[in-house]
Amino acid sequence: MTVRHSLSEELNRQGNEHFSRGYYTEAYTCYAKALEYDRLTGDQRALVATLGNLGNICAVSGRRDAAQANYQEVLELQKVLGDEKGIGTTLANLGNLRADAGEWGRARAYYLE
């Protein structure tokens, strides 16, 4: 395991801790730093986790467009990695995002995909 990968994991752990306490700005900062490291290392699995966390923080913060973009990137990576369980979770996240926006048809399409 590389130092950068360990740093990414630690930043995501800290971000999750902040998120669970409702400190969304601090959580976002941790996830954004982790994303920098993940992109540098090219670790796709770490990138999936970090982008998913960023999508979640954007979703609860009302930043639907950013959440959508993060989840879409996660979905593409999960398809490349063959992560069927992860794909299901991400499609549900995308569906929930659209349902929260009142876009029932789009939400349904994600849920059924």
Name the predicted role of every residue range.
Residues 1-2, 39-43, 77-83, 100:
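Short coil/turn linkers that connect adjacent helices within long alpha-helical scaffolds
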Residues 6-20, 29, 45-60, 85-100:
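Conserved alpha-helical positions within TPR/SEL1-like repeat arrays
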Residues 30-46:
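Short, charge-rich amphipathic alpha-helical segments embedded
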Residues 102-113:
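Short, intrinsically disordered, charge-balanced linker/junction segments flanking boundaries
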